[in-house]
Amino acid sequence: MSKSRDSYFDNAKFLLIFLVVFGHILRSFINDNHFMLYLYKFIYTFHMPAFILVSGYFAKGFKRAGYVKKLAVKLIIPYLIFQIIYSVFYYIMQDESMANVNPIDPQWSLWFLVSLFFWNLLLYPFSKLSKQWALFVSCGIAVLIGYLDFVSSTLSLSRTFVFLPMFLVGFYLNKHHFDLLRSKRGKQIALGVLAAVFVICWGIDFDYSFLFGSKPYSSFGDVTLVSGLSRIGWYVLAFGATFSFLALVPQKRYFFTKWGTRTFYVYLLHGFIIKTLRQVGLEDWLTDYQSLVILLLLTAALTSVLSSNFVKTVAQPFIELRMTSLLQFVRGTGKNAYLK
C-alpha cells in the first residue's frame, strides 16, 4: 500500500463493505428473528449513507480534465458488464423475476454504480450554489421525490436523489472535520448516538425497505405529510449514525486495511455468493441466536477472500478493465502474492 494513502479511510471502507455483506447475509433471517431484524434496520440506517459520504469526500477533483470520461470507464462499463453477468446468473439460478437484461433497471446492488456516476455529475450544478443552499435544495428534492410514483428504481433515480445529501456532505467535508469526529469527546458522543439509533430501530415499527430509498411513499401506504416528515426523520438518524460510525473508525493500519482498497471487488462479486446461499436455504440451517456468530465469521471469510490478490487477478479485467495483476502473475512477479 502506498504510504500516501490514509489508513483511516481504507479502514472505514473495509468496515463498511463488511457491513454491506453482513447486511445482505442477514436479510435471509429477518422474517423469523426479531433481533436480526432490528440489527438489519440498524445497519441499513447508516452503512450506505456512510459509504456514499466517503465517496463524496473523494470527489473533490470533479473539475479536472477528463474526470467524467474516467468516471464513465470506471463505473458505467463495469455496470453494463455485470448487468449482463448477473442477469445470466439469475437465469441459471431460475430466478426469472431477476433475469432481466434491461440496461436502465440495475440488478440488485448495481444501483450504486449508476447513482455514483450521477452524483458526480450533479456536483457541476450544485457546486455553483453555496454549501447551505446546496444541502437545502438536495434535501428538499429528496423529500419531495418520494411523492412522485414514477420515480423509482429505474436508472436508480430514486436512490440518486434520496442519497444525494450524503454525497454532498462528504464533498464539503475536509480533514479537519474528521479530526473533530475522532476526538475523545467525539467518540464518547458517537457511542451514545449509535446506542440511541439502535434503540429506535428496536422500538419503532417501520418497513425496513423505507431505508433503501428506492421506492415512492405510496409503496408504504397512504401518502400524507407524514411521509415526507418520515424521510426527514430518517435523515436525522442516518447522519447521526454515519458520523458516529466514522468517529469510531480506527486510524492505525491493521491487517484488514489493505482490503479497504478493494471494496469495489467485494461489492460487485459478493452478490453471486449471497444469492447462492439464499438459494440453498441458509436460513433453514441456522435458526438460533447463536447463528449470529457464524454469520459474522462467514461475512469475515467472504469479505477477506473477495479482497484477496487471487480474486483481484482473476476479476480485474472485468472490474477495472485492465490486466495488470494477471500480467504480473504470468511474469512471475505476483506468484507469491496469493499467500499475502
Curated annotation (Swiss-Prot):
Subcellular location: Cell membrane
This enzyme's EC code(s): 2.3.-.-
InterPro entries per record: Acyl_transf_3_dom, Nod_factor_acetyltransferase
Top enzyme class: transferase
Topology term for the membrane: Multi-pass membrane protein
GO molecular function per UniProt: acyltransferase activity, transferring groups other than amino-acyl groups
Transmembrane segments: 6-26, 35-55, 73-93, 106-126, 133-153, 161-181, 192-212, 229-249, 263-282, 291-311
GO cellular component terms, A-Z: plasma membrane
Keywords, sorted A to Z: Acyltransferase, Cell membrane, Membrane, Transferase, Transmembrane, Transmembrane helix
Predominant place of localization: membrane
Pfam family of the protein (one): Acyl_transf_3
Family statement drawn from the similarity comment of this UniProt entry: Belongs to the acyltransferase 3 family.
PANTHER family: MEMBRANE-BOUND ACYLTRANSFERASE YKRP-RELATED
This protein's name: Putative membrane-bound acyltransferase YkrP
Annotated source species: Bacillus subtilis (strain 168)
Organism lineage string: Bacteria, Bacillati, Bacillota, Bacilli, Bacillales
Gene coding for it: ykrP
